[in-house]
A protein has these predicted regions:
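A short, conserved structural fragment
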Residues: 50-60
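Short, Lys/Arg-rich nucleic-acid/phosphate-binding segment
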Residues: 58-64, 68-69
Length: 92
């Protein structure tokens, strides 16, 4: 799994500053991101963040943000588990 790019982190941050963990729709998100990104880029990043688990799709074009700390925990857990296994193998 690749880590997030700067653009994706910035989009998450801008949405977080505006909505925190409240529900929002695509139009509201696009309005928030309009000064910085095109509609195409904004939609692409929102879909990607949704796929990765940083944005929950609530159906009917409604979304909510997932706490970044929770995302880091879920992402790093698998990484740390894998590193631990590899480290044990190399240490013999």
């Amino acid at each position: 799994m690749r880590w997030l790019k700067k653009r994706e982190v910035v989009v998450y941050y801008l949405l977080y500053r505006k909505f925190r963990f409240d529900k929002f729709n695509v139009g509201e998100a696009l309005d928030t991101l309009k000064p910085y990104f095109s509609k195409k880029v904004s939609m692409s990043v929102i879909k990607y963040l949704s796929k990765k688990g940083l944005i929950n799709s609530l159906g009917n074009s409604k979304y909510s943000l997932v706490p970044f700390e929770e995302f880091l925990y879920l992402t790093s857990y698998e990484y740390i588990k894998r590193r631990s296994t590899l480290r044990r193998r190399t240490r013999g």
